[in-house]
Design a protein with these regions (language model features):
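N-terminal amphipathic, basic-rich helices that act as targeting or association modules
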Residues: 2-78
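Generic alpha-helical segment signature
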Residues: 10-13, 240, 603
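A generic alpha-helix structural signal
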Residues: 21, 37, 53, 109, ...
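Non-catalytic terminal/interface segments that mediate subunit docking, oligomerization
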Residues: 44, 53-103, 107-109, 113, ...
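Short histidine-centered beta-strand/loop micro-motifs
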Residues: 188-191, 414, 660-662
Length: 736
């Protein structure tokens, strides 16, 4: 008898249970209930987000595969396709930071090579609580070590990403992992069974008890006690995954298999039921044949285990021996555990008894889709209303404090733990506006960027959703890349709270507008709800991963000032906006609004101008203006170039000086160029109706920033670099 306590343990409501009984035609047994629990979880079933996600633009001439498969696929020409996706591993990384982050990397890698692609790069978007608190530092160290430990051992470069710090992430750190791979477009594989009578093979590592109900755990709030959920976190083996990659690609090459699915969230349950549902078939499985590393496992445990480094393959019977020979060579299990059958049902036997008999359509396609109550977000009040924001007494000190804020400070302490050069495709080191990856044998290159500003999104969710897309595309423009597609990881609190659903709906609206403006399709992604501990939700955090193409890598724009005497030009308009800025937060201890406004038409023009100038070879450097505004962008341009080069800049009167220096107005890029190319750039700007102003030059060994001739900031590059470079390492040294 299934009572309310059992339903609560499985995160199912009484109404959902009634629907299950109706679909199955009887009351399910406990193992069958476990199957519905994981497949109808928020993590797998998207029951609170599906009605909104389907509004996203997913079509385009380059789209080979959009949402619905293990990863999105875009045609990039020359017979190649790029396969990419982003996923979250937030809840596991809070409970067990090292393994949570490591298996997040492992899972996204499998999503990519399941499609037949070889992973060529990983990026990550990380959010932690303030690093001056011991627990937050411990989580951060564990997460970074987990990413490095798995990625480095597997042999995939971690080429960039973003790291933010905010008190809201102290109880809910976010670990979003993006992966990109390459495949010949005529050798893409899908999760399908294809034909009745085909063999179902279990390949890879053995099944244990780790990760059981991991998907369900990721679909619920945390309370005061999380230690008991530690067994829900999977344990990864990157060396086993490397063997699995090579064995899978070798079996795919001659077409020995007809379909393949990663055993990720919900494990064997998800892979069997989804493959059957997509192909309109059924599957029969004998659990006695499943390789197990622990004794006495029950059907419930075997079906729901999320042990890592496992795949489900479907092959024609006459090909099974060939597949097994390949996996034996790589010292991996490849065992026939069942077959494809007619009837559209998942039938599972254990010790000779039938323990599961369920319609796959009910498991996969008939999960309820909720239009949850929502409250439209209220616009944030203007910064300074009620309590005016005073100007700093000393702008140079404010500038140095901003450079040392953990969100802005140098992240080399993190990046240096990652191998970013393995595979030798990495063209730009981590820290550039976007990652750039060579396409060997071609002049073309791929670029990728991850972006999302959670504070801006809290203050204005719709603009925050649009701005995440816009900034990711802007970062691509800064390296000379044209955006071609986007994947998303949407991190929110409890969707049962109307204010959270209101934020989510508004973010989706903003993303839709921006994706349409840039004509880029959404190829898939992930929603992570219930980032909520003891009733407190994180700031809404959409993270957008945009992929782009550089037609000639020799014209890619590298970060950093190059030569004394070069002219510094600001593309775009600075407005009187300090709301939601890192300056307001770090210097004044406030998080007022409103967020900076975004005009997508202006944004497109600025990016198009930057791309055109890059293609013409006019730019020596380009850097987008985001956290910290113009002052930080100029400083970073000094740091990424020759360390002995400063800049002298004089800005117009008319705006608050702190808004000029530190405001985060959208749609701006700081570029440097040779004096001989200035007139051509300004002419292009006039023709394209883009505001562009020569604001200074690369000069000396100091960063000197003035307004209408009045000096505001005068700091040596050496002093600024020290503040920026040492901020995060010093936190760990001081508190070691």
């Amino acid at each position: 008898m299934i009572d309310d306590r059992i339903l609560k343990d499985h995160n199912l409501t009484r109404d959902e249970f009634k629907l299950i009984v109706k679909l199955v035609g009887r009351e399910p047994n406990l193992t069958e209930l476990g199957i519905f629990s994981v497949m109808w979880s928020e993590h797998c079933g998207y029951k609170s987000s599906r009605v909104h996600l389907k509004k996203l633009p997913t079509k385009g001439p380059a789209v080979i595969q959009g949402p619905g498969e293990n990863a999105g696929v875009l045609d990039i020409g020359d017979g190649l396709a790029v396969v990419f996706k982003i996923e979250s591993h937030n809840h596991p990384s809070f409970i067990e930071p090292y393994q949570g982050a490591a298996t997040g990397v492992g899972g996204i890698l499998r999503d990519i090579f399941t499609m037949g692609a070889r992973p060529i790069a990983v990026m990550d978007s990380l959010r932690f609580g303030p690093p001056d608190q011991p627990k937050n530092r411990s989580i951060m160290e564990g997460v970074v070590s987990g990413i490095a430990g798995y990625g480095n051992s597997f042999g995939v470069p971690t080429v960039g990403g973003e790291v933010y710090f905010d008190a809201g992430y102290a109880q809910n750190p976010l670990v979003n992992v993006f992966c990109l791979g390459l495949v010949q477009k005529d050798k893409i594989f899908y999760a399908k069974t294809e034909g009745v009578g085909n063999a179902v093979l279990y390949v890879g590592a053995k099944t244990g008890r780790d990760g059981i109900h991991g998907a369900t755990m990721a679909s619920a709030e945390f309370g005061k006690e999380t230690e008991h959920k530690r067994p829900n976190v999977q344990v990864g083996d990157p060396f086993k995954e490397k063997l699995l990659l090579e064995a899978c690609l070798e079996a795919m090459e001659p077409g020995l298999i007809v379909g393949i699915q990663d055993m990720g969230a919900a494990g064997l349950t998800c892979s069997t039921s989804e493959m059957a549902a997509k192909s309109g078939t059924g599957i029969e499985v004998d659990l006695d044949l499943v390789p197990q590393r622990e004794a006495g496992m029950t059907p419930y445990e075997i079906m729901l285990s999320e042990s890592q480094e496992r795949m489900l393959m479907v092959a024609r019977p006459e090909r099974v021996a060939d597949v097994q020979a390949i996996f034996a060579k790589w010292d991996l299990d490849a065992v026939v555990i069942g077959k494809v059958v007619e009837g559209g049902r998942l039938k599972v036997r254990f010790h000779g008894d039938e323990v599961i008999d369920l319609p796959v359509d009910a498991i996969v396609n008939l999960c309820p889709a909720y239009k949850r109550p929502s409250v439209k977000p209220k616009p944030a009040k203007a910064a300074g209303k009620g309590a005016p924001v005073s100007l700093p007494d000393n702008f140079s000190k404010a500038f140095l404090k901003l450079l040392a804020s953990p969100t802005i400070a140098d992240k080399e302490w993190i990046f240096r733990q990652y191998d970013h050069m393995v595979q030798t495709n990495t063209a730009f080191l981590p820290g550039a506006d976007a990652a750039v990856l060579r396409l060997k044998g071609s002049r073309r290159a791929l670029a990728a960027s991850l972006d999302g500003n959670s504070l801006h999104t809290r203050l204005d969710p719709k603009t925050g959703g649009a701005a995440a897309v816009a900034e990711a595309c802007r970062n691509l423009a800064c390296v000379g890349a044209r955006p071609i597609g986007v994947t998303n990881c949407l991190n929110f609190g409890n969707p049962e709270k109307p204010e959270v659903m209101g934020q989510f709906e508004a973010v989706i609206e903003g993303m839709i507008e921006a994706c349409k403006a840039f004509t880029i399709p959404v190829t898939g992604g992930n929603v992570s709800f219930y980032n909520d501990t003891e009733g407190t939700s994180i700031n809404p955090t959409p993270v957008l991963g945009v992929v782009g193409i550089i037609e000639d890598i020799d014209k890619a724009v590298r970060p950093g000032f190059k030569a004394a005497g070069d002219v510094v030009v600001l593309l775009g308009e600075t407005k009187d906006e300090i709301g939601g800025s890192e300056y307001l937060k770090s210097v004044h201890g406030r998080e007022d609004g409103p967020a900076p406004r975004l005009d997508l038409a202006v944004e497109k023009k600025v990016q198009k101008l930057c791309l055109e100038a890059a293609g013409l070879g006019l730019l020596q450097s380009a850097h987008d203006l985001s956290e910290g505004g113009l002052a930080v962008a100029l400083a970073e341009s000094c740091f990424h170039g020759r360390k002995d080069l400063g800049c002298v800049v004089d800005l117009e009167a008319g705006l608050r000086p702190d808004a000029l220096l530190f405001g985060e107005s959208q749609s701006r890029i700081a570029v440097s160029l040779r004096p001989a190319d200035l007139d051509r750039l300004l002419e292009l700007a006039r023709e394209r109706k883009v505001r562009a102003a020569a604001i200074g030059k690369v000069y000396g060994e100091s960063i000197v920033l003035s307004q209408a001739g009045k000096k505001l900031v005068d700091v040596t590059v050496r002093e600024a670099f020290k503040a920026w470079k040492n901020a995060i390492p010093d936190l760990f040294k001081i508190h070691a």
